[in-house]
């Protein structure tokens, strides 16, 4: 939960979600606005974007935009003025204000939840207070963050049959404020076969009913639901947009921001986590590892494995991602030249050394081993055994190449 305490400082930026608060994604924003402005709005949209791409913030901002635009189309009241003349009342965007605070009566939210006690059949509204707080504070968070936020610990989240029935009930009601009734369903991957209860409603919804589904993994969404939705694909955030946001919101230097943006590869959640460990000198740790593998021998290798094993899973994964990032940049350096690399001076020098140390096939083989290691860390592998095994594999991958100290 320290991660959530750390992110409190972004609250002032993202408390009310509008398109102006979104990091990058200008092409997607324009596409969404044109859907509404040109009356081309499908009744069911599926936003698909990887973790940290901003798919959820975009969906939140879009729902606010829809209700604000529908208010503009309402007739303006004409009343008698103070002296008997006609007076036109200025329209107040009350609905947009409610939507930006996540309390609009016509915008309903659905998301994975857990039973509060044994035998419960939980629905999303049981956690609506926590949900509003979560999306105000951590709009770029993932489902793991959300489940930890509500105290799930090791419990699995789910969108239940009871929740599907509650969705059907909510959307059968008459709208209160807006022309539209909106259901924003986050992580439809957590809909099991009970999601089929929603098929008829999605296919033939009541008039002016809008479904907005937000997913990370298209392959895990029920095909029957997928086929009934218009897809909106959210790409990873552009490197420059990520760096700009880190400078403006997290007060990083431009060099720090570019380094973190490069490693996070368009995942803003990952970028925020990397800020927590910005003081970690991954480059020195990597240099020690490679020298232990190629030059110093078994004693140095065991010492290094002891060091990395004490860091904890999150730091271990970040270290592996950093090494993978440098390997990818090294390959780009070979093929594209220095001017196209988002690297600091020290990282560029290190990438050049990696190119002297390994050829492309070796770099690709190392990247595969690092990916496997990250996969096993996610599944609670023994860190000492894992990193010792990777150390041995690195030696055999590079063994046929001339040994160069990574100074």
Task: Identify what each model region corresponds to.
Residues 18-99, 207-210, 216-407:
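Charged, glycine-rich active-site and insertion segments that engage polyanionic ligands
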Residues 3-16:
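Short, Lys/Arg-enriched N-terminal segments with co-localized hydrophobic residues
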Residues 190, 204, 220:
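Residues immediately C-terminal
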Residues 177-182, 206-212:
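Loop/turn-to-beta-strand initiation segments
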Residues 172, 197-207:
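Conserved catalytic/switch belt of AAA+ P-loop NTPases
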Residues 169, 200, 227:
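Conserved adenine-binding aromatic site and its adjacent loop/helix in ATP-hydrolyzing domains
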Residues 13-193:
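Clamp-loader machinery-focused feature within the broader ASCE/P-loop NTPase space
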């Amino acid at each position: 939960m320290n991660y959530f305490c750390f992110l409190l400082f972004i609250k002032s930026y993202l408390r009310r979600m509008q398109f102006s608060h979104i990091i990058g994604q200008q092409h997607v924003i324009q596409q969404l606005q044109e859907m509404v402005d040109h009356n081309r709005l499908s009744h069911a949209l599926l936003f698909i974007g990887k973790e940290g791409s901003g798919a959820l913030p975009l969906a939140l901002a879009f729902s606010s935009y829809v209700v604000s635009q529908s208010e503009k189309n309402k007739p303006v009241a004409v009343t008698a003025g103070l002296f008997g003349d006609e007076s036109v009342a200025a329209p107040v965007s009350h609905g947009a204000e409610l939507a930006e605070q996540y309390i609009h009566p016509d915008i309903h939210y659905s998301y994975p939840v857990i039973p509060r006690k044994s035998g419960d059949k939980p629905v999303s509204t049981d956690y609506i207070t926590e949900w509003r707080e979560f999306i105000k504070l951590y709009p770029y968070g993932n489902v793991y963050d959300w489940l930890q936020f509500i105290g799930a610990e090791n419990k699995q989240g789910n969108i239940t049959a009871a929740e599907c029935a509650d969705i059907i009930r909510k959307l059968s009601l008459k709208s209160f404020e807006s022309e539209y009734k909106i259901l924003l369903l986050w992580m439809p991957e957590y809909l099991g076969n009970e999601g089929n209860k929603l098929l008829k409603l999605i296919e033939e919804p009541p008039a002016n009913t809008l479904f907005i589904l937000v997913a990370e993994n298209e392959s895990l969404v029920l095909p029957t639901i997928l086929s009934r939705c218009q897809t909106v694909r959210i790409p990873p955030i552009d490197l420059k947009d990520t760096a700009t946001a880190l400078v403006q919101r997290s007060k990083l230097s431009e060099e720090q921001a570019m380094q973190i943006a490069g490693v996070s590869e368009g995942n803003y959640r990952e970028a925020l986590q990397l800020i927590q460990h910005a003081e970690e000198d991954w480059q020195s740790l990597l240099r020690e590892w490679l020298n232990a593998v190629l030059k110093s021998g078994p004693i140095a290798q065991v010492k290094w494995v002891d060091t990395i094993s004490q860091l904890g899973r999150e730091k271990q994964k970040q270290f592996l991602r950093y090494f993978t990032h440098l390997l990818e940049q090294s390959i780009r350096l070979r093929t594209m030249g220095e001017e196209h690399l988002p690297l600091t001076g020290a990282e560029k020098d290190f990438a050049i050394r990696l190119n002297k140390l390994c050829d492309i096939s070796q770099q690709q083989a190392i990247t595969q081993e690092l990916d496997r290691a990250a996969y096993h860390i996610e599944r609670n592998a023994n860190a000492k055994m894992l990193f010792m095994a990777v150390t041995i594999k690195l030696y055999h991958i590079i063994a046929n190449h001339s040994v160069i100290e990574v100074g």
